[in-house]
A protein has these predicted regions:
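Non-catalytic, usually N-terminal nucleic-acid engagement modules in DNA/RNA processing proteins
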Residues: 1-96
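Catalytic cores of enzyme domains
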Residues: 52, 89-250
Length: 250
């Protein structure tokens, strides 16, 4: 018998608990969200047109794919709060990025271990660095995959906004068994798309990479690299458009 959604959520929560028990981990997370898409959802094929023809379908990552599991790890409120002031990404925000990416890797490995023991197969794309450094296009966009799975909706800042907000990280796995599929939300979580009342994310992007009708991904990425160099780490982060805004924490 394969894993249920409850089983998967238990693995995620147990992994978080074990991980935060490590004295070197300073980041904290709120209750994770999980959402599932059918591997044959027609929107996966559409991503080849929306994002890139190189974007993978679930069955290109895992032959015989049946379901795509996505989950969101919301940051505790002090993490986005730490990143509101100043031009540079805060150290707390940078560490949360690194520590959450590691956590996602461990969560995926733990889920895969349980699945393998039950005779099932899976594929788990990395939480980050799964994109071309030349054109900055991902072969597996976690946020688009999560949108297909109904985990949230996109905001003006091009980030996924979930029921818990947008300040956090997304992980995903492709599996070869069927799980109950979630419906995509109808309501808008972004106030700009809901009633035109908010453009705070644009104001927060002091670099001018984010505009109402455009996004300069090369400029944005240059800021991410600046912060990575500043902290001498893999924390290619900024997040200014995601913090200090109404949709950061919901």
């Amino acid at each position: 018998m394969a894993l249920s959604i409850r089983d998967i959520k238990n693995i995620i929560n147990e992994t978080i608990s074990d991980y935060t028990g490590n004295c070197n981990i300073i980041s904290k997370w709120k209750e994770p969200l999980i959402s599932v898409a059918s591997a044959d959802d027609l929107y996966f094929e559409k991503l080849k047109r929306i994002i890139s023809e190189k974007h993978k379908n679930p069955d290109e990552l895992l032959p015989g794919a049946e379901s795509v599991i996505t989950y969101f790890l919301p940051f505790a409120e002090e993490i986005p709060k730490s990143n509101e002031a100043g031009r540079d990404a805060s150290l707390i925000w940078a560490r949360a990025y690194i520590e959450t990416n590691r956590l996602i890797s461990i969560i995926n490995k733990n889920i895969q271990y349980e699945l393998e023991a039950k005779g099932y197969n899976s594929a788990a794309p990395a939480a980050t660095d799964n994109f071309s450094k030349k054109d900055l296009i991902s072969y597996w966009s976690h946020k688009h995959v999560a949108w297909i799975a109904g985990l949230g909706k996109f905001g003006l800042h091009k980030m996924l906004i979930t029921e818990a907000g947008s300040a956090g990280r997304i992980g995903s796995l492709v599996v070869d068994f069927k799980l109950p599929v979630n419906k995509r939300p109808v309501q808008e979580f972004c106030l700009y798309y809901k009633n035109g009342s908010c453009k705070e994310c644009i104001k927060s992007c002091v670099f001018g990479a984010l505009e109402e009708n455009s996004f300069n991904r090369q400029l944005c990425y240059s800021i991410l690299k600046e912060n990575a160099a500043r902290y001498n780490s893999s924390a290619d982060v900024c997040g200014k458009c995601t913090v200090g805004v109404p949709c950061a924490i919901l």
